[in-house]
Amino acid sequence: MLILISPAKTLDYQSPLTTTRYTLPELLDNSQQLIHEARKLTPPQISTLMRISDKLAGINAARFHDWQPDFTPENARQAILAFKGDVYTGLQAETFSEDDFDFAQQHLRMLSGLYGVLRPLDLMQPYRLEMGIRLENTRGKDLYQFWGDIITNKLNEALAAQGDNVVINLASDEYFKSVKPKKLNAEIIKPVFLDEKNGKFKIISFYAKKARGLMSRFIIENRLTKPEQLTGFNSEGYFFDEASSSNGELVFKRYEQR
């Protein structure tokens, strides 16, 4: 199984690292082309394009400027330990064992606007470039056109390497849109997390994002290899609802805490 998750806007380059092992991103030539385009933007243009404050725009203009093609543990850190958002709160990679990192390196991929596809131990320099941003480039009007089939091809390589044909889609719609399902040599399973609110079950963004991380951790910790094993997921009160599920969609629900 290959698990797909989204990156996070919040980054952590200060906390102690729980592993010293690292690999290098496999699509850096593409990243370098995007950096070339991003460096043309002024902070006000970045602010408008990304819908962020002037302060954040200044920080990200500096990140684009400081980005270097040579990645070292001094100027970068492992992606799975650098991202800090709701998904990564659930994942808690900072508590992984070396064996957990090994399994994750084979079975987990992070989709990225700048790096395309990241393995957990791939070094990553800080950036902010969401997949849905309309950054004009040499290949088109946005990042979806820039990446084209590249991300899908890289995922197919990972699937072939593990002799598998199942993708667990725990990424957001914005990021999964960078994947071409018809060209992906895999069955796609999408876990959906519903929380009860005033007697009704619905997707609540914060909880759903954290649950994607919890599910990723559940797969990694238990070394799961078959999609039917996912139905045993019960972290933080979630349970599998077979009646609401279908072949491609596994529905998990959680009752409101009273």
From Swiss-Prot:
Pfam families, per the entry: H2O2_YaaD
One GO term (biological process): response to hydroperoxide
Cysteines paired by S-S bonds: none
Signal sequence annotation: none
Cellular component, GO annotation: cytosol
Alphabetized HAMAP family for the sequence: UPF0246
Record family assignment: Belongs to the UPF0246 family.
Identification of the protein by name: UPF0246 protein YaaA
Name of the encoding gene: yaaA
